[in-house]
Amino acid sequence: MFIAHRGLYDDNIKENTIEAFDNAFNNGYQGIEFDIRLTKDKIPVVLHDSFLSRVFGIKGLLKDFTYQELLDKKDIHIPKLEDVINRYQNKVMIIELKEKIDITKYLENPKNDYYISSFNYDYVSCLKKSINYKLGVINYVLNSAVDYSKLNFIMILDTIYNQKLFKFKELEIVIYGVVGKINDYNKELKYIV
């Protein structure tokens, strides 16, 4: 299975947008990975950075804008989490929490395959385990401060792993990056991996 990191984007299609996600699915990807942050009015939206300048060329932090203020700006197309989930039924979604947000009310459709992840263990450990989604952390190595019994999977970044190491924890292993199944490169690379 191939997962498009922030969708399939290029110079003409911005990352973490509906266009990037549509492009990924139209090019054979089975799932998408995207990042969640909150606006000033606490709307969960899809955006990797806390600031708007890199992707949209606009000064300011996401947390300083309401969702309506973002909609009013030209050339900013930041989707709400709810819209992404409703649009891509029956698709794999790896949802990375960039801050502490309880998104579980959006994940009630068991038809979707949701993986909620974060580099910050505290962001996912406060969420309850459910049959509707899987909880995990993103890491470079195993971390003794993490209670793996509260998780369903671990994502290992660009590292060599040993399946026996994870088998005793009964965790699903998701390998992240070029050596694995999630990538943010062009569609040709998808076939090389």
Could you tell me what each predicted segment is?
Residues 1-193:
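Phosphate-group recognition and catalysis centered on beta-loop-alpha active-site segments
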